[in-house]
Amino acid sequence: MVLGLLLSGNISYAGNLNGTGELKMSDQAVRSFIKYIRGEVINGKRGKPDSFIISSNGNWTWYWYCAYNECWQNDKPTVEECERETGVSCGRFAMRRTIYWDNGINTRTKKAKISSKWTDSEIKNELKRL
């Protein structure tokens, strides 16, 4: 199953690494995103989602957790690595539990937020809605 988010545009490195354009999430990308949203337990503590990077073809993902109240992650090197390895555009899909990929539906004033308490089906349905 491939979930598609129809989006338009390109990625701008002028301080904004949020992805734009057409995005097709593979099953593996969806599973990775769900794992990211829920947070893994590391050294007895559940990691807090910090940043999720994805390729526009949905075949490459990378994410970080933050063990502190606030973290500052520089996503630019990861976005560039993704683009080198895949040959397609890449960008930040989410920060914490908020989706930032620009698609016209997911507007600046009303970003899609994903709860870690949602079931897999609820998360998948929200991704399909976008």
Residue spans of the language-model regions?
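Bacterial N-terminal signal peptides
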Residues: 1-8
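Secreted/extracellular ectodomain signature
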Residues: 14-130
